[in-house]
């Protein structure tokens, strides 16, 4: 029988054995013209159905003739319609048997599709089948439904499919995922047979032994490693060689994430729960959730927003909300080891706000983001205000809540923080990030001063090494809100620490007309203090030439001592060489300071000469002003004053006086 062939014509399937068919079996919309003996020899259920069909067809004529007309009229008042329906079905079967010469059986609850029954028929005829992970599951369920057991016939279909599942499917991660996908069409029977559970167990066990270095790829904007350009690979040491050496292994390992995205949400949820109960790495679980969310939630990443293809099925808002809450509830609570996960979490949060997800879902996302806020970018923080209650362009309250979660996490994990000079690197990164966010939202005309002030002071003092970024945000806010009162201006400027402003920021602030007078005075005071410290340090270094000259021969003496005591050991020699090098560096710095001081003296003398010349010119102008032609010569004197840069009342001080007035303070 192995040489027998099958053909399909429209909605009918024929077995071309040279013998006429003697039975019809209908599955879905397909009618199979087959032979009784091959089917009855392998399937107990088909044997029973065919026997019952033949018995019923042979006795149906006698049953019809025995019926009394009076009884029929009486039954019509109660159950007459049911008898008529049975009679009609029997008449249809008799008509089919009379027309075709063989019975017709319709399998109503057959698991799988007509393709599965076609494979069953081929097995009954002895035709070789090509099994796969996608076809073996419905075929196993069909064999169970048709009672194709080993007791009924040796080497039957149930044992054949079980062997294939054990030897080929359960031993492979990707094959187990494909088989699990096939379980969806026959889920009740596949679950009762244990196929679904065994596939999930295989996935969990195989995933735990996979390469953990590959679990970072789903969160990348491109979605995989295949988007890395050749130039980027050349920048990685050995990257091009590694990509040429093992392309197939990496691609195969990455594809099982994509296979998981083909599962339906209920089965995928079961897989994730099994992974969590199996103590799998949080990176594996998180990568699976990220890849599944990117596949089924459109527009979750700003940089990867593509129009949906015609082949993709539209997902309703309720389904997206359910999926989003499932993804969020299963995310690991601990900090992710994948830095780019933060952008994905912000995308989830934006989608949760748009879909009006549950409050607990949004709170979980905010806490998760807060635990790794130092990895965020300014673009991540710019979440639009989707609520009509917020007048601002961006959701400032959201950022304030996330920042609060970050500070709580930082306080709870003091032992895990590596501090440098008493400052936390994570805290300083967040401080720079918040300053950038403040500068971005400061131009919003609807931003209240209290909200700006509260967000600016929410960070501790050690979060900022310099307050230049905060000053920039304050300046932008005052420029965009000219109607703010003087008291509010002073309050907003109070968020800055003028001692943390750099010299460039102090110079700009001293000339800033938008700052209140109190703030300008503070800036000028600390700017003058910085200049005094700088000048004092330069003078102290320059006023000790005798000390440096008297100690200049020391390097040669130290070198002679080093040559004499070479045999004292390698350690002593190394220390002395280091001391000699430090001494040479110190002498060189002193020489540079002397040169700088000489240059400064030269500039001071030149300024004194210019000042004396200006005094003479001004005195000459004053003498000419006493003549009657003063009114006519005023434009000339004004031009001379402008020529020498005297915008205000001229005040010249001697460089040898104890107090010097900075020219920037006069411009303020």
From Swiss-Prot:
Q: Where is the NPH3 domain?
A: 254-530
UniProt-annotated stretches for the region Disordered: 73-98
Decide whether keyword Nucleotide-binding is in the record: no
Matching entries from Gene3D superfamilies are given as: Potassium Channel Kv1.1, Chain A (3.30.710.10)
Q: Explain the purpose of this protein.
A: May act as a substrate-specific adapter of an E3 ubiquitin-protein ligase complex (CUL3-RBX1-BTB) which mediates the ubiquitination and subsequent proteasomal degradation of target proteins.
The free-text domain note is:
The BTB/POZ domain mediates the interaction with some component of ubiquitin ligase complexes.
Q: What is this protein called?
A: BTB/POZ domain-containing protein At5g66560
Organism this protein belongs to: Arabidopsis thaliana (Mouse-ear cress)
């Amino acid at each position: 029988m192995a040489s027998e062939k099958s053909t399909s014509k429209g909605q009918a399937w024929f077995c071309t054995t040279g013998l006429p068919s003697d039975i019809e079996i209908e599955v879905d919309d397909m009618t199979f013209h087959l032979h009784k003996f091959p089917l009855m020899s392998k399937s107990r259920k088909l044997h029973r159905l065919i026997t019952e069909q033949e018995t019923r067809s042979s006795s149906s004529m006698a049953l019809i003739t025995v019926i009394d007309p009076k009884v029929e009229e009486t039954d019509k008042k109660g159950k007459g319609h049911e008898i008529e329906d049975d009679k009609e079905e029997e008449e249809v079967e008799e008509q089919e048997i009379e027309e075709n010469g063989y019975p017709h059986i319709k399998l109503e609850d057959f698991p799988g599709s007509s393709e599965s029954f076609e494979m069953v028929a081929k097995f009954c005829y002895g035709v070789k089948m090509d099994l796969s992970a996608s076809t073996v599951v419905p075929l196993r369920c069909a064999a169970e439904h048709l009672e194709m057991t080993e007791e009924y016939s040796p080497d039957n279909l149930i044992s054949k499919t079980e062997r294939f599942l054990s030897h080929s499917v359960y031993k492979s991660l990707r094959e187990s995922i494909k088989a699990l996908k096939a379980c969806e069409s026959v889920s009740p029977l596949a679950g009762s047979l244990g196929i679904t559970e065994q596939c999930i167990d295989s996935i969990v066990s195989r995933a735990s032994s996979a390469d953990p270095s590959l679990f970072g790829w789903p969160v990348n904007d491109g979605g995989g490693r295949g988007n890395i350009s050749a130039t980027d690979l050349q920048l990685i040491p050995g990257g091009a060689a590694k990509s040429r050496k093992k392309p197939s292994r990496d691609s195969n390992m990455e594809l099982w994430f994509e296979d998981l995205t083909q599962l339906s949400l209920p089965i995928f949820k079961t897989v994730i729960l099994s992974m969590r109960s199996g103590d799998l790495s949080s990176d594996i679980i998180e990568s699976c959730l990220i890849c599944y969310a990117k596949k089924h939630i459109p527009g979750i990443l700003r940089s990867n927003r593509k129009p949906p293809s015609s082949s993709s099925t539209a997902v309703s808002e309720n389904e997206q909300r359910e999926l989003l809450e499932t993804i969020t509830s299963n995310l690991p609570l601990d900090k992710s080891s994948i830095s780019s996960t933060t952008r994905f979490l912000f995308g989830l949060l934006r989608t949760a706000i748009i879909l009006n997800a549950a409050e607990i879902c949004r709170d979980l996302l905010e806490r998760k983001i807060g635990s790794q806020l130092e990895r965020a970018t300014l673009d991540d923080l710019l979440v639009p205000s989707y609520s009509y209650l917020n007048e601002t362009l961006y959701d400032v309250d959201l950022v304030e809540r996330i920042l609060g979660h970050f500070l709580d996490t930082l306080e709870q994990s003091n032992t895990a923080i590596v501090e440098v000079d008493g400052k936390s690197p994570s805290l300083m990164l967040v401080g720079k990030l918040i300053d950038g966010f403040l500068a971005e939202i400061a131009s919003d005309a609807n931003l209240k001063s209290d909200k700006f002030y509260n967000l600016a002071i929410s960070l501790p003092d050690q979060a900022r090494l310099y307050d230049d970024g905060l000053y920039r945000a304050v300046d932008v806010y005052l420029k965009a809100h000219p109607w703010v009162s003087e008291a509010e201006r002073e309050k907003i400027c109070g968020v800055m620490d003028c001692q943390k402003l750099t010299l460039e920021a102090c110079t700009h602030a001293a000339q800033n007309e938008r700052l209140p007078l109190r703030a300008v005075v503070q800036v000028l005071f600390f700017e003058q203090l910085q200049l005094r410290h700088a000048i004092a340090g330069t003078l102290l270094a320059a006023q000790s030439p005798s000390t440096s000259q008297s100690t200049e021969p020391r390097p040669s003496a130290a070198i002679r001592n080093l040559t004499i005591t070479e045999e004292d050991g390698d350690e002593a020699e190394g220390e002395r060489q280091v001391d000699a090098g430090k001494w040479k560096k110190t002498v060189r710095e002193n020489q540079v300071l002397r040169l700088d001081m000489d240059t400064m003296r030269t500039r001071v003398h030149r300024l004194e000469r210019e000042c004396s010349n200006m005094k003479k010119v001004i005195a000459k102008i004053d003498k000419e002003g006493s003549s009657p032609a003063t009114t006519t010569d005023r434009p000339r004197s004004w031009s001379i004053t402008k020529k020498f840069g005297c915008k205000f009342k001229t005040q010249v001080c001697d460089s040898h006086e104890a107090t010097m007035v900075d020219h920037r303070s006069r411009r303020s």
